[in-house]
């Protein structure tokens, strides 16, 4: 839907790039940009595999001060299947490679199959694979108005780690 892109632009981001395999998502993002009083022509949309796109950015030395990575739990495309539990570290590594020095990576999942500890581990493994030191500076979960019922841990699905690049 482009919600993160809209918020980034509204907060003053000089450049906003949205990567999603589903082309229809980009049409919605441009429409939401327009509805928010933003020029949709200023939103760069890339309908492609995120990991491959991050690799291309790294090859071109393109870097970002802030990366918001909120992958789907599962998706499939021409390059194969993406499974968040299996592929998070790869996504973290690609993100770390294009994160500017002193940049921030917002890494999120709403998968019940990924714990907060597994999210942290993916960030650590991805950072190490990229040769980048990432430090988690904040963790966010569900807000208080989304209580989780006792005995239903699957209800605590949202995990977000905000990491800073320190090397």
What are these regions (language model features)?
Residues 3, 25, 53, 75-77, ...:
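Flexible loop/turn segments at secondary-structure boundaries
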Residues 99-101:
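Helix-to-beta-strand junctions that scaffold the AdoMet/dcAdoMet cofactor pocket
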């Amino acid at each position: 839907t482009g919600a993160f892109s809209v918020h980034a632009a509204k907060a003053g981001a000089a450049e906003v790039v949205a990567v999603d395999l589903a082309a229809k998502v980009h049409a919605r993002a441009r429409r939401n940009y327009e509805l928010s009083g933003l020029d949709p022509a200023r939103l760069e949309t890339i309908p492609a595999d995120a990991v491959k796109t991050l690799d291309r950015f790294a090859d071109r030395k393109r870097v970002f001060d802030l990366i918001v990575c909120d992958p789907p739990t599962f998706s499939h495309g021409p390059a194969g299947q993406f499974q968040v539990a299996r592929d998070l570290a790869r996504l973290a590594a690609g993100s770390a490679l294009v994160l500017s020095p002193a940049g921030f990576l917002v890494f999120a999942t709403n998968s019940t199959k990924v714990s907060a500890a597994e999210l942290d581990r993916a960030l650590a493994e991805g950072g190490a694979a990229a040769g980048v030191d990432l430090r988690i500076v904040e963790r966010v979960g569900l807000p208080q108005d989304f209580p989780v019922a006792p005995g239903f841990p699957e209800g605590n699905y949202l995990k977000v780690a905000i990491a800073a690049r320190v090397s």
